[in-house]
Amino acid sequence: MFVKTGDKVKVIAGKDKGKEGTVLSVNAKTNRIVVKGVNKIKKHEKPSQANANGGVVEKEGSIHASNVKVIAKKEDNNK
């Protein structure tokens, strides 16, 4: 896959066209990625031990990898 976790990308298609962000996670099987600050969705969560109140949580949803282009690769300091 051409996108890796940590790369800086720009959305080129869809409702968030023009937005930029860092790749948080990559699913190579479905060709979908999660970009920080892009494709925000509201998730309703039940109360649990970790989140006593529950409620509506806003988080990033995944988008197809073909809808982004890489602006800057993550710098690898292991070389």
From Swiss-Prot:
Q: Which cysteines in this chain are paired by disulphide bridges?
A: none
Instruction: List the InterPro entries.
Output: KOW, Rib_uL2_dom2, Ribosomal_uL24, Ribosomal_uL24_CS, Ribosomal_uL24_KOW, Translation_prot_SH3-like_sf
Named from the GO MF annotations, one term is: rRNA binding
Protein function = One of two assembly initiator proteins, it binds directly to the 5'-end of the 23S rRNA, where it nucleates assembly of the 50S subunit. One of the proteins that surrounds the polypeptide exit tunnel on the outside of the subunit.
Per the record, the similarity remark reads: Belongs to the universal ribosomal protein uL24 family.
Q: Which SUPFAM superfamilies match?
A: Translation proteins SH3-like domain (SSF50104)
Q: Write the record's keywords in alphabetical order, separated by commas.
A: Ribonucleoprotein, Ribosomal protein, RNA-binding, rRNA-binding
Is Endoplasmic reticulum included in the keywords of this UniProt record? no
Q: What GO biological process terms are annotated to this protein in UniProt?
A: translation
Q: What is this protein called?
A: Large ribosomal subunit protein uL24
Please give the HAMAP family that the UniProt record associates with this protein. Answer: Ribosomal_uL24_B
Q: Which Gene3D superfamilies match?
A: 2.30.30.30
Q: Short name of one Pfam family for this protein?
A: ribosomal_L24
Q: How does it assemble?
A: Part of the 50S ribosomal subunit.
Provenance organism: Lactobacillus gasseri (strain ATCC 33323 / DSM 20243 / BCRC 14619 / CIP 102991 / JCM 1131 / KCTC 3163 / NCIMB 11718 / NCTC 13722 / AM63)
